[in-house]
């Protein structure tokens, strides 16, 4: 009977010890938090509010239930947003802007107090649309293409300055897409068609002019040739014409001789045989 009481007492003490260890382990686990690489933590204290210091990478202690860590990713990340803006000549353009951003580490407690964890979603689209509309309004629609480097530079400078007011650093800014409204696109297409028609008409005129010049040169050559033949005939009589006729007949005969499918039939009534019906 005494051994049973000892066993029960031992098990009771063991259970109490296990419970105590469990409570201690839970308390210890609640007192630790880890900040991974490329991250920073901001502590919120229930009595003092947001603490001014920023906690770096590693495992750290806190007061359970009184302090809460909030983790920020401080690595450079991309953010893309679109904006529909009006140009100086009252055309609508669609622009897509990509920025690479990161928070200013020393100002993370203030960012948490004013903007929270999703600071980029609250700030970047707003200031991006504001800057794009302000810059695009200074250019005509066609200038956005011909002067694109200048437009990008103005957007970059204005957006970097505006983002710093919210403690956000921008490492890179690029206009990735630009498209015009349907009305302007039709006008550009009509202009291109008109330019192509003008080039085609210019080509037709140039071709006709070249053909006219060729006809004049050809007529002058034929006139000179006729004059030379006339002069030669006047000096040598009809002999030159007979010579040209003989040369032409010789060329025809040579051509016929090379063709196996052509038979030569002499003129006259006797055909191939020298027959005289009168004899």
From Swiss-Prot:
Induction: Transcripts levels decrease upon imbibition but remains stable at the protein level. It is a single-pass type II membrane protein. Keywords: Acetylation, Membrane, Mitochondrion, Mitochondrion inner membrane, Signal-anchor, Transmembrane, Transmembrane helix. Mostly expressed in proliferative tissues, including vasculature, shoot and root apical tissues. Accumulates in dry seeds. Its main location: mitochondrion. Residues 2-6 are mitochondrial matrix. It is found in: Mitochondrion inner membrane. Signal peptide: none annotated. Residues 29-279 are mitochondrial intermembrane. The chain crosses the membrane at residues 7-28. CDD domains: SPFH_prohibitin (cd03401). The modification N-acetylglycine is found at residue 2. Gene3D superfamilies: Band 7 domain. GO terms for cellular component: cytosol; mitochondrial inner membrane; mitochondrion; plant-type cell wall; plant-type vacuole; plasma membrane. Pfam families: Band_7 (PF01145). InterPro entries: Band_7, Band_7/SPFH_dom_sf, Prohibitin. Prohibitin probably acts as a holdase/unfoldase for the stabilization of newly synthesized mitochondrial proteins. Component of a prohibitin multimeric complex in mitochondrial membranes. Belongs to the prohibitin family. PANTHER family: PROHIBITIN, PROHIBITIN 1. This is Prohibitin-4, mitochondrial. It comes from Arabidopsis thaliana. The lineage of its organism: Eukaryota, Viridiplantae, Streptophyta, Embryophyta, Tracheophyta.
